[in-house]
Regions:
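Class I SAM-dependent methyltransferase "Motif I" SAM/SAH-binding loop
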Residues: 10-13
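Short beta-strand element of Class I
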Residues: 26-28
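Conserved SAM/SAH-binding beta-strand->alpha-helix loop
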Residues: 34
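Short, conserved SAM-binding/catalytic segment
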Residues: 41-51
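Cofactor-binding loops of NAD(P)H-dependent oxidoreductases
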Residues: 55, 60
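Class I S-adenosyl-L-methionine
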Residues: 63-73, 83-166
């Protein structure tokens, strides 16, 4: 199997990165705004700690940081903040500004031009599915999404997740 060079945006503590790394793929950059998550990720990936960045995606895109990866990355993946989309959020804050951060993820994808894109989130983000697919299509990708039951894939959780891929 070919080794995939990947970037993980909204990496959190590194669940997606861990899975890809475990399969032999190469983490090139991981970014999250939460410093506690970044500390955890650096402990789990000590040899990659220089490529694990505590950064706001909005600033990253506006300041045009890390563009040296343009056309060198196979996959950009990420799980944009889900609080406003989550059914566990009893207030279900549809106007939560974090609900729009996926747009900055897509803007970074547009700048880096990876071969593939993977977005993971709660099922509530389906309200943005048409916009996500349209934006990916506008930058040259053929995108789709699937609803997946986490426990069907060995994850000890009984919850559904949505995956956009192209």
């Amino acid at each position: 199997m070919k080794k995939i060079n990947f970037i993980d945006i909204f990496c959190g503590a590194g669940g997606l990165s861990y899975s890809f790394k475990k399969k032999g793929h190469s983490l090139k950059l991981a970014i999250d705004i939460d410093s506690s998550s970044i500390k955890t990720l650096k402990k789990n990936f000590p040899s990659f700690k220089d490529n694990i960045i505590n950064e706001d995606i909005v600033k990253l895109v506006k300041q045009k940081k890390y563009l040296n990866f343009k056309n060198k990355i196979d996959l950009i993946m990420g799980g944009p903040p889900c609080q406003g989309f989550s059914t566990a959020n009893r207030q279900n804050i549809l106007n939560d500004p974090r609900n729009e951060l996926y747009k900055f993820f897509l803007e970074y994808v547009k700048k880096i031009k990876p071969k593939y894109v993977l977005i993971e989130n709660v099922i509530g983000i389906r309200t943005k599915a048409d916009d996500i697919i349209k934006n990916l299509s506008n930058i040259g990708y053929v995108a789709d999404f699937r609803l997946i039951q986490a426990s069907d894939y060995g994850i000890p959780q009984n919850r559904k997740r949505i995956f956009f891929f192209c």
